[in-house]
Amino acid sequence: MACLLLCGSAFAQEKVYTLQECLNEGLQNNYSLKIQRNNQQVSDNNATLGNAGFLPTADLSGRYSGSSQDTETKLRDTREIVKENGIFNQTIDAGVNLNFTIFEGFNVSTTYKKLKELQGQGELNTRIAVENLVAGITAEYYNYIQQQIRLKNFKYAVALSKERLRVVEQRYRIGNFSGLDYQQAKVDFNSDSSAFMKQQEALQSSAIALNELLARENLNVPIAVADTSIEVASELQFEHLMSSMMENNTSLLSARRDSRLAMLDYKLKVSQTYPYVRLNAGYGYTLNKYNKGANYHRGSLGADFGVTIGMNIFDGNNLRRERRNAKINIENARLEQTDMEQTLKSDLYNIWQAYRNNLQVLDLEKENLVTARLNYEIAMERYMLGDLSGIEMREAQKSLLNAEERLLTASYNTKLCEISLLQISGQVQAYLQL
């Protein structure tokens, strides 16, 4: 009794997750998304004025050096040879050096623009990862519901077969049914029981897949979801989806950004044909210590500066080759963008057609299920009266189960089309607001 109370209490306290809660948990914990966010942070860190070359560089340096020498000098007047051994001189330097590029053919400003574009590309890549994860979690969430409903249908099939087996067994014992009827009912019951057990495995596999997307530590734990049916949106409009896709599709936005990056790469090559102006300045102190001679030490403190002006005159035509290749890359980026637009339009047309077709199939299967249930009820009444054979009863049962399965499949397929339409149009994050 105590065990039952504890189990009941644990079941009552089990967390029930809505789709939005699953999405929020996945967006917070998914490892692939965390990696992409780290990559975005790298591109954010790189998009700085200093990395582009707008800011000067300053170095603080210090140096110590010494020399030990033995000298031998022959005097011109007296022909005397003077030897000095162990002459030890020392030099100490310390200073600050400043370098600044004043002009480099617009290379610095173009580099900064490229870094900002790369930063935006990193944000787009993160958005793509988020949209893929939202679509993946949503699809698996409803697949889990699909597997739960299918398990319920199989359980219902087992109950029907069990009831049929009970009726046949009773009538077989009193001689109303043959042994063949009894054996067939038993085979059908075992077949439905086997299908039920296999469906339990499919449900567990879906739970594992959903837990993996949510980055949960324990993957093999069933998850309780709030929804018990698959509701589909039937109000989507093609014109709105097309317009939204052309404006918001992340893959298309990424292709457009690639075109801008290709143009900036070309400008960087062109900038190398301009002259450059660089400024350098320094301020430091130097101390020399002498072991011999009239001076014991000498120190100097001061500044130095300079301006360097230069220009690339000839580099073996490599720069010209690189500019030509950069132009080709611009054309390729434009073609890839156009190809991406065509591919997305084609995908949208195909998914839309599948979506509309599945909506019609869904309505049809709802009607079929009503008819199949009515047929089963009539068949069951005739079977109980002995006017229907076991095989005919089994066919009525299979007709009902098949109708339930077709309706379930149509519902899930329509939901997948809905998810794909929202994703391709850049609106899949709307599931976060449900």
Give the role of each language-model region.
Residues 406-434:
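Acidic, low-complexity, intrinsically disordered peripheral segments
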Residues 34-38, 51-52, 88, 102-130, ...:
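Sec/SRP-type N-terminal targeting helices
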Residues 13-14, 61-100, 226-235, 267, ...:
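Small/polar, glycine/serine/threonine/aspartate-rich low-complexity segments that form flexible
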Residues 180, 387-409:
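Short terminal targeting/anchoring segments
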Residues 172-176, 383-387, 424:
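A short glycine-centered flexible hinge/capping loop motif at secondary-structure junctions
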Residues 12-63, 69, 217-260, 341, ...:
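Bacterial Sec-pathway N-terminal export signals of envelope proteins
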Residues 7-9:
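N-terminal signal peptide c-region/cleavage motif recognized by signal peptidases
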Residues 17, 21, 45, 132-244, ...:
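Periplasmic alpha-helical coiled-coil/stalk elements that build and connect Gram-negative outer-membrane
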